[in-house]
Regions:
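N-terminal presequence-like segments and the immediate start of the first folded domain
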Residues: 1-57, 61-74, 80-126
Length: 126
């Protein structure tokens, strides 16, 4: 089955050898996004809530390039430097997804330079 890779003029450019989004078999896989702007400047010095919104906005931009949104998410992976930020993240996250909520994993991670990274899998057939 063929794969299709997407690039976005709104999401940060990839910082390595990966695509912003890849579609295969009706699923769109979004690469992990962080609080970076289009010029790849990290904003890890901002409050967590600002970093979370910037990260989810970047993920939404990656979804949009495939003609979808985070409301099409069926799985989300969340990586937090500080697990105490989980409640604040969840409040913001609910603005971007819809019920039934996607399956989600939230793990503590030794992120460097920022407090959050989020990836997702979207279902086109929704």
């Amino acid at each position: 089955m063929p794969r299709k890779a997407y690039t976005s003029d709104r999401a940060p450019l990839p910082a390595g050898s990966y695509s912003v989004a890849v579609e295969a078999a009706g699923l769109v896989f979004l690469a992990g996004q962080t609080p970076r702007d289009r010029d790849n400047v990290r904003h890890g010095d901002k409050p967590f809530e600002v970093q979370a919104r910037m990260t989810l906005d970047n993920l939404e931009a990656a979804a949009n390039v495939a003609g979808l949104s985070l409301k099409h998410a069926v799985r989300v992976g969340v990586f937090l430097r500080n697990p105490a930020d989980a409640k604040a993240f969840d409040t913001i996250y609910r603005e971007y997804v819809r019920e039934p909520y996607p399956a989600r994993t939230l793990v503590q991670s030794s992120l460097v330079g920022f407090d959050i990274e989020v990836d997702a899998v979207l279902l086109r057939a929704d």
